[in-house]
Structures are given as C-alpha cells and as structure tokens.
C-alpha cells in the first residue's frame, strides 16, 4: 500500500514539474514576442518620421505605366532654343549634354558621346601613371577591335592610337575625339533637333518616358561636371 502511494506521488510530482517547465517556456515566448513587436513598431515609426522630414525622398522623376522613368526637366524653352544654334552650345550645357545622351540611347549609339566625355576627362589627367591607366581603359573599351563600346573610326586613326597606346600622351585621342565629334555633329545632332526629346524641351512640355535598352553601367553625362579620376569608371 505504501508502495502504491509512493508510486502515485512520484507521478504527480513529475506532472507538476512538466507543467511548471511548460509554463516557464510558454511565458518566456510570449514575453520575447511582445518585445520583438515593440521593436518593429518603433523602427516603423522611425522610418515614417524620416520620410516626412526628408524632402529629397521624393525624387525628381515620375513613373510611367510601362515602368520607365521620365525625368522632370527644369530647362527653359529659351535655353533649349540656344542648343539649336550650334552643336558646341548643346554639349557645353549640362542639361543639353544629358538630353543629347538620352536621344543617342534611343538610337543605340550612346558610345559616341560616352567616348567624347571620356576623352574630355582624359585630358585632365595628372601624372604619367594616371595617363597610362586611363588611356588603356579608353582603348580597351572604345578603340580596340570588338571593344564593348567600339566607336566608328577610320583605319588610319585607329592604327595611330594602337601603335602609341604603350606610351600615351594627353593628346593620344585628339584625332579620334575630333572624328567622333564630327560624326555626331553632322549626323546625330541633326536628328536630335527633330526629335521629340528636343521639341518637348523647346516647347516647354513635360518630358516623355524613354524606352531604354538594358546595358551595363556606362559613363553618363551626369558625371561630366564632377568626374572621378578613378579608372574603374570605364571598366
């Protein structure tokens, strides 16, 4: 009889311990879940607060139904009219350069303006090492046969650059840059002046979304005014 009583007593003790252990674990889980919920709520409030405080969160772009972005331009019609006076006036204005680059992208020939911009930056190089590194990068990206963004150059101009690329100077790409400039001025610039991109600017109309092909990152006109000297820009 004593044995039986002791047996039931042990079972009750075990059950009591198991229930106590379960309650401890269950209670701890509730407490942890409550803490996590409070942390998430606090983080959400902080994010919302930052969005309200920072006006730059609203970018100067608008999304079209097709998923492309159309940049809101602040170019005055008077300024746009000046771009039609000469190709040089177009390229010397940051917004003009950007508009022309967007146009070339619609024709899949942006490598021309990218090469021209790269040459402009190359002429600002300082020191033999920087000249050599940038010259090599430009050559491999725009000049050599089957380059990723090979520009259209005559055989002689291309050969001169190839033969001198091991000992480049600040004027190594002058002839090629001049050639590409002439091609853009005589061909692309004429079509640009008749394009919707330019006509919208000249009439003060909102810019339309532009369908762009997907490409790897390239040197853009937005970096023209504050170009980095790091050769990785063109790699």
UniProtKB/Swiss-Prot annotation:
Q: Which GO terms describe its cellular component?
A: cytoplasm; plasma membrane
Q: Which residues cross the membrane?
A: none
Domain RGS stretches: 86-202
- Which Gene3D superfamilies is this protein grouped with? 1.10.196.10, Regulator of G-protein Signalling 4, domain 2 (1.10.167.10)
Where does it primarily localize? cytoplasm
Q: Please list the tissues where expression of this protein has been recorded.
A: Expressed in peripheral leukocytes, bone marrow, platelet, spleen and fetal liver.
Cite the entry's keywords alphabetically.
Cytoplasm, Phosphoprotein, Signal transduction inhibitor
Q: Where in the cell is it found?
A: Cytoplasm
Q: Name one GO molecular function term.
A: GTPase activator activity
Which sequence positions carry the modification called Phosphoserine?
A: 49, 216, 218
Which Pfam families does its entry note?
Answer: RGS
Q: In the UniProt record, does the keyword Signal occur? A: no
User: Which GO biological process categories is it annotated with?
Assistant: G protein-coupled receptor signaling pathway; negative regulation of signal transduction; regulation of G protein-coupled receptor signaling pathway
> What job does the chain carry out?
Inhibits signal transduction by increasing the GTPase activity of G protein alpha subunits thereby driving them into their inactive GDP-bound form. Binds to G(i) alpha-1, G(i) alpha-2, G(i) alpha-3 and G(q) alpha.
PANTHER family assigned to the protein according to its UniProt record, in alphabetical order: REGULATOR OF G PROTEIN SIGNALING, REGULATOR OF G-PROTEIN SIGNALING 18
Protein name stated in the entry: Regulator of G-protein signaling 18
The coding gene here is RGS18
């Amino acid at each position: 009889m004593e044995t039986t009583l002791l047996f039931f007593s042990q079972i009750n003790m075990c059950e009591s311990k198991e229930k106590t252990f379960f309650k401890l674990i269950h209670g701890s889980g509730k407490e942890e879940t409550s803490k996590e919920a409070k942390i998430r709520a606090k983080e959400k409030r902080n994010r919302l607060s930052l969005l309200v405080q920072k006006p730059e969160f609203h970018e100067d772009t608008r999304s079209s139904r097709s998923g492309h972005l159309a940049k809101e331009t602040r170019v005055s019609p008077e300024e746009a009219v000046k771009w039609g006076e000469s190709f040089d006036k177009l390229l010397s204005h940051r917004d003009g350069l950007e508009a022309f680059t967007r146009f070339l992208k619609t024709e899949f020939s942006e490598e021309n303006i990218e090469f021209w911009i790269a040459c402009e930056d190359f002429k600002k190089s300082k020191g033999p090492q920087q000249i050599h590194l940038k010259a090599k990068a430009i050559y491999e990206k725009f000049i050599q046969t089957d380059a990723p963004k090979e520009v259209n150059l005559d055989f002689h101009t291309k050969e001169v650059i190839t033969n001198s690329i091991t000992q480049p100077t600040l004027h190594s790409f002058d002839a090629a840059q001049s050639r590409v400039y002439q091609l853009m001025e005589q061909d692309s610039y004429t079509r640009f002046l008749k394009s919707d991109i330019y006509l919208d600017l000249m009439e003060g109309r909102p810019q339309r979304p532009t369908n762009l092909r997907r490409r790897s990152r390239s040197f853009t006109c937005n970096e023209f005014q504050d170009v980095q000297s790091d050769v990785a820009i063109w790699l």
